[in-house]
Amino acid sequence: MTDQQVRIVSLGDIAPNRRRGGDLRALLTPTTAGSTSGFMGVAIVQPGDRIAEHYHPYSEEFVYVTEGALEVDLDGVPHSLGTGQGLLIPQDMRHRFRNAGDVEARLVFHLGPLAPRPELGHVDTEDAEGNALPCDGAHAGHAAGHERPAPAAEVVS
């Protein structure tokens, strides 16, 4: 038997994070649910809205579209992702999401493994309006000699 407490978290329990665009809600995290290997959340993206380009130096990101459709740029290469489709975004791959449709899009995301500290897990490369941010090589995993690998991704219907 385990001593771990079961925690049910509702979308409405989590405040929206709009700093990167869209409405991002990290539902199941070390803080909210006691997770130790990753975290899961939901992104709600209105028509014409976007989630700014970023990458994760320690984690892969698994995404699954539950409603609507999104354009996702993977290291600058655009791909379409629709309802019922999933995508694995490799560690270190730059990515951004756009809702080019006319209905709300919802995306479930999971990242794992966790970064050594939360502030190291996410590197923004542009702001919510799409303006490039300076890239600090000492930021995130780069301080430990971490290098970005060559791009690779696959979208499967």
From Swiss-Prot:
Residues 116-157 are annotated as: Disordered. This is 16.7 kDa protein in whiE locus. It holds the Pfam family Cupin_2. Belongs to the SchB/CurC family. It comes from Streptomyces coelicolor (strain ATCC BAA-471 / A3(2) / M145). It comes from the Bacteria. PANTHER family: 16.7 KDA PROTEIN IN WHIE LOCUS. Residues 42-108 form the Cupin type-2 domain. CDD domains: cupin_TcmJ-like. InterPro entries: Cupin_2, PKS_Associated_Protein, Polyketide_Synth_CurC_prd, RmlC-like_jellyroll, RmlC_Cupin_sf.
